[in-house]
C-alpha cells in the first residue's frame, strides 16, 4: 500500500479511537492523568470523540488553548491555573501524537507565548509536599511493621530506593537479585520506552524481603488472596500507622520519597547522583523538592534507613 495513502487513511479514525491508541502508549500514571484530561476537553467541547481526525486538519489550536486557559469555573467549581496548564499540556501532547500518527497531516498545537496570554508559566517554585525527618520515619516504620509487614517493606523500599509506589508495586521476582543485594526497577518513559534502574540495597533490608517472598513466583507484593495490590490499600495502612505513632504529619508514599530526597541532599550527595537514581529530569526538579523541606549503571545509595 502506498505509504502516503496509508497515513491519510488514519484520518478516518475517530478522535475517540485515536485517544485510546495514544493512552495505551503511556505509563500507568500518565495514562490516568491524560485520560482525565481528555474527558475534560470533551466536556469543554474542545474535542468531539465521535468525529474523525480529518476535522483536525482545520483546527485552530490557538483558539482551543485560549478556551482552556480562559476557563474560570467548571461544573460549579473554580479552576486553578495548575489545572488549566495540565489540561493544556494534555491537549498539546495529544495533537503531537496525531501529528506523528498521520505523518504531518495534522499540525501539532504550539504553546502560546504572547505577553499576558502565555500557555505555560511558573506557578510556584516548590513542590507542595511536606517532609519528615529520619527520626520520624523510623518511628513511623515501627508502627507500620505492626499494621502490615508487607507495607512496612514497601515503605522502606520507597525511602532507601527513592522510588515511587507504582514502581515498587510492579516489581516481579525476577527483578530481585539477592546474591548482589540489588533490585532492578523498570521505569516507563515517553513513547512507551522503558529503562532499567538497578539499585543496591542494604543487606538487612534484602534479607527481610527474601524472608517475606519465600519461594514465590510472580509479583513481589501481593494481597492476601494473591491478587495485585491497589495503591489505596497501602495508603490506608500508612494512615493507620501514622495515627498509631502519633504523627502530626499525614504520611503518604509521596511524603516518604520527598523526605528521602531531602535527606540525601542534606547528606551531601551530588545532585547528578540523586537525579540518576530518582529519575528526576533536571536539577530544577530536584531543587523543587529540596527547597521545600535505556539502562543505567548500578546505583549505590547511602544507607539512610
UniProtKB/Swiss-Prot annotation:
Keywords: DNA integration, DNA recombination, DNA-binding, Plasmid, Viral genome integration, Virus entry into host cell. Pfam families: Phage_integrase. Residues 127-303 form the Tyr recombinase domain. Belongs to the 'phage' integrase family. This is Virulence plasmid integrase pGP7-D. GO terms for molecular function: DNA binding. Transmembrane segments: none annotated. The lineage of its organism: Bacteria, Pseudomonadati, Chlamydiota, Chlamydiia, Chlamydiales. InterPro entries: CB, DNA_brk_join_enz, Integrase-like_cat_sf, Integrase_catalytic. One of its GO terms (biological process) is DNA recombination. The active site is at 188, 257, 289 (o-(3'-phospho-dna)-tyrosine intermediate). The keyword Mitochondrion does not apply. Disulfide bonds: none annotated. The keyword DNA-binding applies. It comes from Chlamydia muridarum (strain MoPn / Nigg). Residues 13-99 form the Core-binding (CB) domain. SUPFAM superfamilies: DNA breaking-rejoining enzymes (SSF56349).
Amino acid at each position: 500500500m502506498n505509504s502516503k495513502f496509508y497515513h491519510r487513511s488514519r484520518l478516518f479514525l475517530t478522535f475517540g479511537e485515536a485517544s485510546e491508541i495514544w493512552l495505551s502508549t503511556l505509563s500507568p500514571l500518565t495514562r490516568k492523568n491524560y485520560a482525565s484530561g481528555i474527558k475534560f476537553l470533551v466536556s469543554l467541547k474542545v474535542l468531539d470523540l465521535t468525529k474523525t481526525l480529518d476535522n483536525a486538519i482545520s483546527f485552530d489550536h490557538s483558539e482551543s488553548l485560549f478556551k482552556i486557559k480562559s476557563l474560570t469555573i467548571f461544573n460549579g467549581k473554580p479552576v486553578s491555573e495548575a489545572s488549566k496548564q495540565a489540561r493544556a499540556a494534555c491537549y498539546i501532547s495529544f495533537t503531537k501524537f496525531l501529528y506523528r500518527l498521520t505523518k504531518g497531516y495534522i499540525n501539532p498545537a504550539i504553546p502560546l507565548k504572547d505577553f499576558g496570554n502565555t500557555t505555560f508559566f511558573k506557578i510556584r517554585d516548590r513542590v507542595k509536599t511536606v517532609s519528615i525527618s529520619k527520626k520520624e520515619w523510623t518511628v513511623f516504620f515501627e508502627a507500620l511493621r505492626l499494621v502490615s509487614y508487607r507495607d512496612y517493606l514497601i515503605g522502606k523500599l520507597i525511602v532507601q530506593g527513592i522510588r515511587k509506589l507504582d514502581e515498587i508495586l510492579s516489581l516481579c521476582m525476577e527483578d530481585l537479585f539477592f546474591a548482589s543485594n540489588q533490585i532492578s526497577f523498570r521505569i516507563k518513559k515517553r513513547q512507551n520506552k522503558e529503562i532499567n534502574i538497578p539499585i543496591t540495597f542494604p543487606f538487612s533490608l534484602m534479607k527481610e524481603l527474601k524472608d517475606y517472598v519465600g519461594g514465590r513466583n510472580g509479583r513481589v507484593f501481593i494481597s492476601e488472596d494473591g491478587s495485585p495490590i491497589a495503591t489505596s490499600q497501602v495508603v490506608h495502612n500508612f494512615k493507620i500507622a501514622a495515627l498509631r505513632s502519633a504523627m502530626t504529619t499525614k504520611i503518604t508514599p509521596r511524603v516518604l520519597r520527598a523526605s528521602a530526597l531531602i535527606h540525601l541532599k542534606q547528606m551531601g550527595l551530588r545532585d547528578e547522583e540523586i537525579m540518576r537514581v530518582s529519575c528526576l529530569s533536571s536539577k530544577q526538579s530536584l531543587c523543587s523538592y529540596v527547597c521545600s523541606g535505556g539502562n543505567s549503571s548500578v546505583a549505590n545509595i547511602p544507607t539512610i534507613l
